[in-house]
Amino acid sequence: MSATAVNTTTQLPVGTWTLDPTHSSAGFAVRHMGVGTFRGRFEQFDAKLTVAEDGTADFLGTVRADSIVVKDENLRAHLLSPDFFDTERYPELSFSSRSLRHDADELVLDGELTIKDHTHTVEARGTLTGPAETLGGVVKVGVELEAVIDRTEFGLNWNAPLPGGGIALGNEVTLTVELELARAAEPEA
């Protein structure tokens, strides 16, 4: 059995890169009752990375808030309600960045995260792997990013006191994306 080497880099290859949703994920984690970590994910999201010849890059990611997946339907309904995402009024979350930089071996995106009607600057850190060519000739890169936010800054304020003290949910939420992005085909001249 042989291992295949994967190039890990902070250099962004020039081009327009679009999401391969089959091989990508978007999720979150938050402390629950001070004793565990609750995790959820989103099923519908998109991302696009455009890298210019001069090395500047734009990133845009969007998430359908009502595509949230958790293991309990009552909890899911609560997360869709005005107590949390209020998906009838705010169907989409978004992150956009025009500031990509490198910090040692990490890729850093400084961008604007919008949840509900709240927009704040957020730093997302992670890795860029590839490029690699698929068996079908498509060139891909992998982008894994993590950002930590205070959910109350985005209007996600619901909480409940626990009988023995403390609160049901932590305010700090870790957002994660693991993306495979495919380079768009060059237009024929």
Feature-to-residue mapping (PLM):
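Low-complexity, acidic/polar, glycine-enriched regions of mature
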Residues: 1-189
